[in-house]
């Protein structure tokens, strides 16, 4: 697909309506007659290959060319965490005083099938002067994207990696090692909890193989928003998926925990673009979801399948109600959707590591406008009922302000938690 300017990318959510001669407004899309015209318009634009395999058509475009990401990747005989390949990375914009390695390991997807996952290990060159081995922070960056070029391992080598919230430079300044998993997995399954957990935990396993001096390091996980999905699921899955791994704790903020809540707060509102992207991401792990896509929705999915976060978020300006794009009324209430929602709601089992959860709260100021606080407070209660040690902090601000407001406290919690392991 040709490279588009950001305004052009952001406008693509309404491009089909414009091409059909219909105003691309949320109100217009609720008309059955309008949707029939849009579906007819989109159907004529689908290729034979897209019609033949609708699931394959929404998968991200593979990264082409020889090198680290090249196929074929033979997983025969490998166990989770086995290293497939590793290479040193020299970013286009040099960062003095650090060493960067990206690596690929064997893992499993949501259905238990073998898949490769990738991660990046960033280490200060300065010797660790503290007691014991150098601490490690597993930094689950909010990727919130659908294309493989948005994965941290790919972006960091091109000097375009952006940390949000900006913890990475602060962690490196403390002389910690930082592991950046590509937690959306090989299909960029944005928001799929089990896939994210496996990617994170197998990345940690792989890290201990390529850097054995870190195998006994005190380790914490961290993530915000989309990265918090990976963090809470990795914390929950660790006792039975990777029981040999030890973590001092996990901290997550702005955590989406319940897609029933997100359906009410984001669908048809300013968050509709990212909610739509998360729907596509889930469909990549649950192929049966594609059955719910009308032709117009499916055609849009094929157009945005490689998009990074900014244009996906900007598409929320259209405030499209995804329900009207489905082939059935009230698709969110369908057995397919409800099964996926249930499978991606954490809380069924409790982590064994201490956990800090924080969230923008109306009780402090504003409150998170996209991700309702009640979802995370329910998770706190469920995990505590399961015997977990969970601290909850309500912080001031909406979704973005809360991330920054919590940074000092989160950094202190990380420091204290890592030091308690010595």
Where are these regions (language model features)?
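Alpha/beta-hydrolase active-site loop
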Residues: 163-167, 190-213
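Catalytic-loop region of hydrolases
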Residues: 15, 19-118, 123-126, 384
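Catalytic active-site module of serine/aspartate enzymes centered on a nucleophile-bearing elbow/loop
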Residues: 386-422
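Short, surface-exposed "cap/lid" segments of acyl-processing enzymes
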Residues: 109-173, 182-184, 368-370
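Accessory cap/linker subdomain of secreted extracellular hydrolases
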Residues: 38-74, 255-350, 367-370, 376
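Primarily recognizes the serine-hydrolase "nucleophile elbow" in alpha/beta-hydrolase
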Residues: 205-273
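Active-site-adjacent alpha-helix of alpha/beta-hydrolase-fold enzymes
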Residues: 362-390
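Short beta-strand/loop motif that positions the catalytic acidic residue
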Residues: 351, 357-364
